[in-house]
Amino acid sequence: MFNMNINSPVRFVKETNRAKSPTRQSPGAAGYDLYSAYDYTIPPGERQLIKTDISMSMPKFCYGRIAPRSGLSLKGIDIGGGVIDEDYRGNIGVILINNGKCTFNVNTGDRIAQLIYQRIYYPELEEVQSLDSTDRGAQGFGSTGLR
């Protein structure tokens, strides 16, 4: 069903000379680091759209998932949103959320997030009157416990 050549390159454009190419930091890294093209200041409890000045063409049957970097997560920096659709061709922006207690500064060229390519499935949706039952049912949000 998925006829995708995993060795095909993903095409990207540097929109300005401030943009840096996405990079993997090790051969086994799942994500490609994304870099800020500008300086930003994010006060505690605030969020900021960080521009990369990179646009790219996602592989067929894939989307890009923008994920946090573990080092930034330790500082209370998280990601908002985080999906790059297969047909999006604009400047890739990353929403950084400062959950920390101190102002967070982003400098031009800082690694701000990682881009992970994931396969996507486009099912047909069918509205029905009821769903088959399961042992769990509609129990959610902590219903399975911690252990």
Curated annotation (Swiss-Prot):
Q: Where does Mg(2+) bind?
A: 24
Q: What induces it?
A: Expressed in the early phase of the viral replicative cycle.
A GO MF annotation of the entry reads: dUTP diphosphatase activity
Catalyzes what?
dUTP + H2O = dUMP + diphosphate + H(+)
Tell me its cofactors. Answer: Mg(2+)
Transport listed as a keyword:
no
InterPro entries this protein is in? dUTPase, dUTPase-like, dUTPase-like_sf, dUTPase_trimeric
Question: Could you tell me the EC number(s) of this protein?
Answer: 3.6.1.23
- What general EC class does the enzyme of this chain belong to? hydrolase
An individual GO BP term: dUTP catabolic process
Q: Which UniProt keywords apply?
A: Early protein, Hydrolase, Magnesium, Metal-binding, Nucleotide metabolism
The reply on keyword Hydrolase is yes
Q: Name the CDD domains on file.
A: trimeric_dUTPase
Q: Which family does it belong to?
A: Belongs to the dUTPase family.
- Which NCBIfam families does the record cross-reference, listed alphabetically? dut, PRK00601.1
Q: What does this protein do?
A: This enzyme is involved in nucleotide metabolism: it produces dUMP, the immediate precursor of thymidine nucleotides and it decreases the intracellular concentration of dUTP so that uracil cannot be incorporated into DNA.
Q: What is the protein named?
A: Deoxyuridine 5'-triphosphate nucleotidohydrolase
